[in-house]
């Protein structure tokens, strides 16, 4: 019984870790090009990153740390920012059309 519980605990931990992690290839694409449409960046550390005018349409940024990031003029249409940290993030002129915000609300700005 004790072994079964240990196996189940390890399996659940592995599943939870993989379910909340970003795709490293997508993060590399973003870092190399500044664009990443429909990318999986959930939980990514993007603090103080310059993403000025980046194309992040449809990106999954759920739980991402965007504190202090520059998202001026970025296209975040249909992106998911639920649970993301946007403290001190610059978003002037960003497209937020059908975008899920950190609190779960959906806004339609710049459509």
Predicted segments, located by residue:
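Tandem repeat scaffolds
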Residues: 20-111
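Bacterial N-terminal signal peptides
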Residues: 8-14
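N-terminal signal peptide c-region/cleavage motif recognized by signal peptidases
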Residues: 16-18
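Positively charged n-region of N-terminal signal peptides that target proteins for export
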Residues: 1-5
């Amino acid at each position: 019984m004790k072994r079964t519980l240990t196996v189940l605990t390890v399996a659940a931990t592995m599943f939870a870790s993989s379910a909340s992690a970003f795709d490293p290839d997508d993060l590399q694409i973003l870092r190399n090009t500044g664009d990443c449409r429909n990318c999986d960046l959930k939980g990514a550390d993007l603090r103080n990153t310059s993403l000025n005018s980046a194309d992040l349409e449809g990106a999954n940024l759920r739980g991402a740390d965007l504190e202090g990031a520059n998202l001026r003029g970025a296209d975040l249409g249909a992106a998911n920012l639920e649970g993301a940290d946007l403290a001190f993030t610059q978003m002037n002129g960003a497209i937020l059309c059908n975008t899920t915000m950190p609190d779960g609300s959906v806004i339609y700005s710049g459509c």
